[in-house]
C-alpha cells in the first residue's frame, strides 16, 4: 500500500532496559488474572522468562525486513533520556515524529497503568489461583491490589533483582544491546545506563508483607460496601 500510494512508513520503537520490562510485563500478566502467567512466582519467572521478547535486536530485524533499518526510529524508554519540551514520554514521542509540543496538547492522565511490585504483585498472584471467571470480581481485587501498591509504606522499596541476578539476567542480552546501539543508533556508548538500583532484594517474607495483606483485604471489603 505504501508503494502504491507513494508514501513512506516510519516505525517508532521504544525499548526499555530488560530488567525493568521483566517486572512490568509480569505485573501486567498478574493484573489481567486469567492467563497462564498470572500465577507464576517472580523467582521462577526471572530465571526463565518464557515467551517474553527481551531480545530487541531480533525483533527490530524482523521489522527491518519489511521497512528497512533506515525507517526504524529506536527510542529509549527511560525517564532520564526522554527528550523534548518537558522530558516526558509524550514530548519524546512528538519530537521523534517532528511535531512541536505546544499547549494545544492536553495530557489528562500521565500514569494510568502503574505496575504492581513486590508485595502487591505477590498477593494478587496468589489470589489469582482461586479467582472465579468473573470480570467484576477480578476488577475488584485488581483495584484493591493497586491501592495496596499506591499506599504502601515509603520504606517498602525493595529491588526485584540482587546484584548477581541482575548481572546474569542482563548478561543474556549484552551483545544484542550492543548491536542495537551500533546498527540502529549509530553510537559507541552503551544502549542503556547499566547502574543497578540499590536496595534490599525483595522476598515474600519481608517485614511489610503483613500490613500489605491487611491493606489489600481491607480494600476488598471497603469496595464491596460501596
Annotate each predicted stretch with a short phrase.
Residues 1-226:
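Anion-recognition interface
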Amino acid at each position: 500500500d505504501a508503494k502504491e500510494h507513494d508514501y513512506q512508513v516510519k516505525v517508532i520503537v521504544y525499548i526499555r532496559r530488560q530488567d525493568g520490562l521483566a517486572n512490568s510485563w509480569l505485573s501486567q500478566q498478574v493484573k489481567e488474572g486469567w492467563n497462564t502467567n498470572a500465577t507464576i512466582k517472580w523467582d521462577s519467572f526471572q530465571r526463565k522468562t518464557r515467551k517474553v521478547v527481551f531480545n530487541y535486536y531480533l525483533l527490530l530485524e524482523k521489522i527491518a525486513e519489511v521497512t528497512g533499518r533506515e525507517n526504524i526510529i529506536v527510542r529509549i524508554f527511560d525517564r532520564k533520556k526522554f527528550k523534548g519540551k518537558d522530558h516526558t514520554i509524550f514530548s519524546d514521542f512528538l519530537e521523534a515524529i517532528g511535531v512541536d509540543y505546544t499547549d494545544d496538547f492536553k495530557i489528562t492522565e500521565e500514569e494510568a497503568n502503574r505496575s504492581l511490585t513486590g508485595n502487591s504483585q505477590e498477593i494478587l498472584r496468589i489470589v489469582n489461583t482461586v479467582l472465579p471467571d468473573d470480570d467484576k470480581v477480578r476488577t475488584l481485587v485488581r483495584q484493591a491490589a493497586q491501592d495496596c501498591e499506591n499506599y504502601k509504606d515509603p520504606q517498602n522499596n525493595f529491588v526485584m533483582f540482587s546484584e548477581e541476578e541482575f548481572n546474569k539476567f542482563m548478561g543474556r542480552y549484552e551483545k544484542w544491546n550492543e548491536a542495537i546501539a551500533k546498527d540502529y543508533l549509530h553510537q559507541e556508548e552503551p544502549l542503556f545506563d547499566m547502574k543497578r538500583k540499590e536496595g534490599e532484594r525483595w522476598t515474600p517474607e519481608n517485614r511489610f508483607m503483613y500490613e500489605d495483606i491487611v491493606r489489600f483485604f481491607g480494600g476488598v471489603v471497603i469496595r464491596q460496601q460501596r
